[in-house]
Amino acid sequence: MKLNQIKEVMRKYGKAWEKQNVSLILDCFTSNGIYQESPLSKSYKGHKEIKKFWENTVLKDTKNIHFKFGNCYISKDGKTGFAEWNCTNLYRGKKNKMAGIMILKMKGNKISYLNEYWNTQVDK
């Protein structure tokens, strides 16, 4: 894994969120990739499950998304990537400010495993 692979997939991932583009998010993942949206939430395995999650949650409940990735890192053994990110959005009509980090495993230029850890501040 190389740093530029992580940065490129993060650009595409952020664009997919901002454009709410299911095809683009699926293009970030291998066909059997795992998307763990949060450590305590259900994991989505493969394009079919990821697409269903996006259609039922992201497209339905989330609007006005602005995504920015920050620093990216690679583990010493080169097998795991990490990426910081920030996001603002409207989720079910409420303004959110989010900050998080992703743990990534890659196969080529696609994500084979992604686990996000994030925190949300909701405007009142």
Model-derived features: where do they sit?
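Short, low-complexity N-terminal intrinsically disordered segments enriched in polar/charged residues
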Residues: 1-31
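A beta-strand edge to alpha-helix "cap/lid" segment located at domain peripheries
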Residues: 2-5, 51-124
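Residues in well-ordered alpha-helical elements
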Residues: 23, 47-48
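A short gly/proline-enriched turn/hairpin at secondary-structure junctions
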Residues: 34-45, 58-62
